[in-house]
Amino acid sequence: MSIFVDETTKVVYQGLTGSQGRFYGLLNRDYGTQVVAGTSPKKAGTDVDGIPVFANVGDAIEATGATASCIFIPAPGVKDAVIEAAGAGITFIVCITEGVPAHDEAWFFNKLRRDFPGTRLLGPNCPGIISPGKANIGITAGHIAKAGGPVGIVSRSGTLTYQALYELQQKDIGVTTCVGIGGDPVPGTSFIDCLRAFEADPETKAVMMIGEIGGSAEEEAADFIKSSMTKPVTSYIAGVTAPPGKKMGHAGAIVSGGKGTAAAKMEALRDAGASVGLNPTEAGELMARVVAEL
């Protein structure tokens, strides 16, 4: 099995007619994802390489039965795009867009929880999600992901998501689903959300978790691992040498006031029983040992 998306998931791309939306929408379709529609208010009635374009998400759902969306809308329009998708009945939204104001993120995070509890948002500012061999929604390179399980991956970092997939592929270890939750301060889907889903998935036997400096998400995940995970977890935390007060790539990747350090996160994870690597390759080697003992 996989979590959140599989070969039956039908996806509408909000922003399919833009350069990035078109590029990745077609790439995802070529991977095997059911990319059934795009939206663009000014280009309704046209198509992108055979994919029909509709004026809005509601029209796309009515025509195609889409249940998921992928957002490639410029940052100022993301708030409206998220609520449009949720209001139309989309149950899984992947938002790739970077630079969404934190105020907007907090607003639609709470709006979804209050008014659309049946809708899950992944992102913003994330690489997306891939269930290898089944579906790829976002910007992850499908050729580095080996299908077949038994490992689930969840990561805050985009590039380290790819590195984790590559490390496992090199060791001939398959992945059920790889989720990039994004590095912004207010992610729609958390480490804990993914850990809980992997724990419930019968085909996922172990989990690799990639964290980074800033915030307390990894410490909270460690508490969940300690209290609720029966499956082994390996981890890597990026930013061991990051100077305090300097943002490292993501809006959420900053050590402030002595909090959010890599050392503190690694200690919390070790205390929870997770195996912690000092670099991505070591994290992959730790997972290889875990898989060998399954």
Cite the ranges covered by each PLM segment.
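Catalytic-core regions of core metabolic enzymes
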Residues: 1-294
